[in-house]
């Protein structure tokens, strides 16, 4: 059983704060259309409400597609203990927000809806990016292209980046020796 979140099919969730643009990080992204103050609810992350089991199934299908040379991006967000939101729908421009190791926004569940919130003031023209928070287990499968000074080269949650740096340093020492 699934249901739609607040935006209607075929209509993007309106946001006066962002515009879609080509991204230096990956494909398309969202940029600030005007200055965004810290704490602003920038845009709602919308899509199909699905069970955890269905979310797991879709994730496996999309990861298999990536292995077959297709997009394979996963746009599933945790909503609560029973349901997730699959944002892989055309009316969800928030799905275009790329990962950044130096995030300027973050997702937050507020009254059963997922909002992207500004962590700091964001300048007009600046690309939005949040920490995807991937676990360390499959870190090699998620190279990071954000290019920030704090980026270890792979998408992992902030608390695990030091581990990736240590693993890479050990590999570099082994290769040099």
Regions found by a protein language model. Give the residues of each.
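C-terminal SET catalytic tail plus cysteine-rich post-SET Zn-binding segment of SAM-dependent SET-domain
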Residues: 100-177
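Catalytic cores of histone-lysine modification enzymes
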Residues: 10-108
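Protein maturation boundaries and topogenic segments
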Residues: 1, 7, 11-12
């Amino acid at each position: 059983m699934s249901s739609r979140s607040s935006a209607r099919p075929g209509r993007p969730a309106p946001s006066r704060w962002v515009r879609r643009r080509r991204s230096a990080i990956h494909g398309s992204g969202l940029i600030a259309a005007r200055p965004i103050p810290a704490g602003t609810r920038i845009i709602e992350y919308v899509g199909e409400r699905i069970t955890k089991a269905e979310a797991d199934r879709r994730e496996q299908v999309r990861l298999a597609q990536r292995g077959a040379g297709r997009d394979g991006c996963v746009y599933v967000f945790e909503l609560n203990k029973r349901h997730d939101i699959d944002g892989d729908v055309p009316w969800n421009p928030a799905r275009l927000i790329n990962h950044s190791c130096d995030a300027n926004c973050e997702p937050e569940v507020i009254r059963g809806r997922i909002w992207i919130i500004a962590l700091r003031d964001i300048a007009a023209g600046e690309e939005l990016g949040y920490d995807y928070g991937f676990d360390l287990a499959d870190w090699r499968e998620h190279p990071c292209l954000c290019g920030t000074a704090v980026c270890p080269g792979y998408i992992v949650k902030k608390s695990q980046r030091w581990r990736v740096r240590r693993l890479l340093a050990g590999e570099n020492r082994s290769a040099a020796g």
